[in-house]
From Swiss-Prot:
ShKT domain span: 205-220
Keywords: Calcium channel impairing toxin, Disulfide bond, Ion channel impairing toxin, Neurotoxin, Potassium channel impairing toxin, Secreted, Signal, Toxin
PROSITE patterns listed in its UniProt record: CRISP_1 (PS01009), CRISP_2 (PS01010), SHKT (PS51670)
Name of the protein in its database record: Cysteine-rich venom protein VAR5
PTM comment, free text: Contains 8 disulfide bonds.
Length: 220
């Protein structure tokens, strides 16, 4: 099995938050089904709004095994390095990873939106529109082939940005050679007319790293 080579996405950093918040760590734990739904719904809502539109964007769903992997990553409190590939390979599939850190607790929707907002500095097919900006979180959030994910949060008291949020995405995005084309441009669901949910495809290829005829498999 040939593993996809991935570029690691850089970590999104939120400096000292303005104002106060009533959130605490327990409010953000991803063992809570309501938090899981918030995370998945936020991703799917954003994936539906990409511009230019995507014809092959898959619908995301929650996966508890991936969430456990994200939890292990969060518990490391290593905000400077992403999890080694061996630590985020699940079922033979290499998964992508996004980090978000903040000094005060923020909602998952806030962190996910911050990743997506990197699109303001991204041009499809070209990449970053200015030097020194991060776009890898955005391209992972909207990577068309990623369809399963899990997230976790940890409190890292020895870090200035102590609230550490981690999401992992399978299969991972930011594949070498096409990371600035995270999806195929076209009318929403044009690639999956019989398997569509409000602009997102619902026919993932679970054999993506094993078979070269995956496009045919997903039509069945």
């Amino acid at each position: 099995m040939i593993l996809l080579k991935l570029y690691l996405t850089l970590a999104a950093i939120l400096c000292q938050s303005r104002g106060t918040t009533s959130l605490d760590l327990d409010d953000l734990m991803t063992t809570n089904p309501e938090i899981q739904n918030e995370i998945i719904n936020k991703h799917n809502d954003l994936r539906r709004t990409v511009d230019p539109p995507a014809k092959n964007m898959l619908k995301m769903s929650w996966d508890n095994i991936i969430a456990e992997s994200a939890k292990r990553a969060a518990l490391r409190c290593n905000q400077n390095e992403h999890t080694p590939v061996s630590g985020r390979t699940i079922g033979g599939v290499v998964c992508g990873e996004n980090y978000f850190m903040s000094s005060n607790p923020r909602t998952w929707s806030f962190g996910i939106q911050s990743w997506f907002d990197e699109r303001n500095y991204f041009k499809f097919g070209f990449g970053p529109t200015r030097a020194g900006v991060m776009v890898g979180h955005y391209t992972q959030v909207v990577w068309y082939k990623s369809y399963k994910m899990g997230c976790a949060i940890n409190l890292c008291p020895n870090e200035p940005l102590k609230y550490f949020l981690v999401c992992q995405y399978c299969p991972g995005g930011n594949v070498v050679g096409r990371k600035y084309e995270p999806y195929a441009i076209g009318e929403p669901c044009a690639a999956c007319p019989n398997n569509c949910d409000n602009g997102l495809c619902t026919n993932p290829c679970e054999h993506s790293n094993q078979y070269i005829n995956c496009p045919d498999l997903t039509k069945q």
